[in-house]
């Protein structure tokens, strides 16, 4: 019975690691698009994608003036 809890804990930790790796990858893509990850974009910024991190779900970039 104890082995079940150890296996469950290991699977839970692996799932957390893979989510973190994906969030880091999306943050790098956001930086490549010259944006930054924030919880909410400011009024003068445009949402250009998603970072999908828990605390910073949006990729924001300054709007271009025409």
Swiss-Prot record:
Disulphide-bridged cysteine pairs: 37-51, 41-60
Entry similarity comment: Belongs to the beta-defensin family.
Gene (name only): DEFB107A
Gene Ontology terms: cellular component: extracellular region
Function: Has antibacterial activity.
Name used for this protein in its record: Beta-defensin 107A
Signal sequence region: 1-22
A GO biological process held by the record: innate immune response
Lineage: Eukaryota, Metazoa, Chordata, Craniata, Vertebrata
Superkingdom of origin: Eukaryota
InterPro entries: Beta_defensin_dom
Keyword tags: Antibiotic, Antimicrobial, Defensin, Disulfide bond, Secreted, Signal
